[in-house]
Amino acid sequence: MFDLVIKRANLADGKGEVDIACQSGKIVEIAKSVLGESKEIIEAEGCLLSPPFIDPHFHMDATLSLGTPRLNVSGTLLEGISLWGELKPLQSIDDIIARAMKYCDLAVAKGIGAIRSHVDTCDDELKGVQALLEVREKVKDYLDLQLVAFPQDGVIRDSTALRNTKRALDMGVDVVGGIPHFERTMSEGASSIKLLCEIAAERGLMVDMHCDESDDPMSRHIETLAFETKRLGLEGRVSGSHLTSMHSMDNYYVSKLIPLMVESKINVIPNPLINIMLQGRHDTYPKRRGQTRVRELRDAGLTVGFGSDCVMDPWYSLGKADMLDVAFMALHVGQLSSREDMEWCFDAVTKNSAKIIALEEYGIEKGKPANFVLLQAKDKIEAIRLRAHRLLVVRNGRIISRSNPIEHTLYKPEGKTVFNELS
């Protein structure tokens, strides 16, 4: 007897409806019709069954802190960093844990199966590190949480950041992070990349660097990151997050830069909701969109995955843990409007991001863990168009979130009409 069978589900490959049988936490059969009894049967009725959404870039130590101690009035990255500096001394480890656990509940209900969260390493108490290591343990049965040691104030600029970043890694943080564009000078930014990549190489860790989150076309730290990746043999293990300055760079320089990134197999993590909000703040009109060159980077063969970055924190007042909101924004800002492009945007919040964070055994295939989300949509494009309702979230063959389909009832002169938004 199976533990769970999903009947008549459409998979992301668009090849038609199938049944999926789960037993002992694994997918044991995928067929047009699965025969045999099951403890529970779910009728998908042609809805899309997707692998879990993956968020490759988030700040869980800051999430849901909106308004403490004040709001970001200018809406800029730099005021957000300043505001975060005011907030850090006011929060306790328990505060961070409580907010993070609430966010994890939101994320799971929205079908997120894994989050890579940066955690600030510039306070001697390492409050965020202590808190999120505890959260990682608490949520491990239903959410994969990968942590990045992130020296928010600059690993060189802040006198204790290097020591504390190493302490965080010793405590069990997974990935080496950095922020070269926030160092005092371009040369110190380059030095910080060299230093942090060497630490990652020595420890056998991945790197995820906030890089060139600026409108300044001369912010070119991604070039140094690509060089150090190649020099240290870190190909495929390094991600450049944001890369917003590429939006403003000279096309000739970009034509030289992208092949260097390809040679180093750099992963790319734009954060569309935040990039479109924070960038271009010094512009009048025309006003820059700020999102990096997604199409060109993808077409060059680089792995591109979209992150959500922030939800209700010093940098962003909105958000609801919805990776389809992220894909929806990326599609518009990047003018990714062909059917192939729109379907790829769905991949950028699922399988591409899973590859970036090196998530093992991901996908809906026989023998893999039974991790998936059932969406109230027929295919990937409709899922993005509707930011589709999550009907079911399954982790290791166990239903961990369930909700009823959304329907609308209209009362018209000729009578009552019940419908949903599916095409």
Positions of predicted regions on the chain:
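N-terminal metal-binding scaffold of metallo-dependent hydrolase/deaminase domains
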Residues: M1-G36, K380
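C-terminal cap of metal-dependent C-N hydrolases
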Residues: K355, K366-L422
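His/Asp/Glu-enriched, well-ordered alpha-helical/loop segment
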Residues: M206, F227-V238, I274-L278, R288-L375
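Active-site mouth loops of central-metabolism enzymes
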Residues: L83-A98, V148-S159, P180-S187
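Active-site gating loops and adjacent loop-to-helix segments of metal-dependent hydrolytic enzymes
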Residues: L64-I96, G172-V175, H221-S239, V262-N267, ...
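Histidine/acidic residue-rich metal-binding segments in metalloenzymes
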Residues: K127-D141, D158-N267, D283-F306, Y362
